[in-house]
Amino acid sequence: MQTFNNKTFNCVGINNTISILRSNRFQIVKVLIIKNSKADKDRGLNSALNLINRDLVQKVSDKKLLSNFKTQGVSITFSGDLISDEFSDFEKNEDLCLLVLDRVEDPQNFGQIIRTAECAGIDGIIYSRHHSAPLNETVLQVSQGAFVNMKFYEVTNIRNELNKLKKNNFWIVGLENSIDAKPWYSIEYSDRTAIVVGSEGRGIRKKVLETCDFIATIPMQGITNSLNVGAATSAIVFESLRQKLEKK
């Protein structure tokens, strides 16, 4: 697995900035704020800025310095490690739930999935190094700060990693329309589980699907016969959360 050591990133917006400032995972390089902007007046952001050296905060009048995205008047530059080296928690936690992305190529979808997964209490995201959206600034931006609280594992072979998970007592659930598929709510996710979702156009690859212990599907009644991968992921990860909360 690859680790991006001290790679520098830039994000904009109040939520992203606050999340990064409050995290101990990253080194802050610079915070740029437009004077009298929404960000400049935000109490939560100003409180979070007290956590860093104020010399790193620069207030400017020129709005053109933050012309991309909907910035709300703030950008943050930071560095750090986003990708974890190993599955260090596997021996400790008996109800881990991981999300596995099999060649999800759209950065917007990747970012939205991160946000959804973090809200649903997913413990980590595994994704392929090749033929997948990289963990870049667009992905981080769309996640709205959720990436700060998520572990990421970049792998070269999804199928091999799933087999490793099986050896660590994980059940593998693939989300795919299939004759053998069961409704997503009829599968148990309260034990160690890895949920696999596929690419936007092609779904889960055949060999990866063959590795799964269960195939889940989301029944539909409309004329449109498919969901966006982000929407489909949302349904299954929140079902996982519902079962865990019900079990407690």
Feature locations, PLM:
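N-terminal positively charged helical leader segments and presequences
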Residues: 1-88
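Structured adenosyl-cofactor binding patch, chiefly the S-adenosyl-L-methionine
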Residues: 141-144, 209-248
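RNA substrate-binding interface of SAM-dependent RNA methyltransferases
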Residues: 19, 49, 58, 87-182
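Short, acidic/turn-prone active-site loops that include or flank metal/cofactor-
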Residues: 36, 62-63, 130-132, 200-202, ...
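Short, glycine/polar-rich helix-capping loops at beta-to-alpha or helix-loop-helix junctions
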Residues: 44-45, 132-138, 202-208
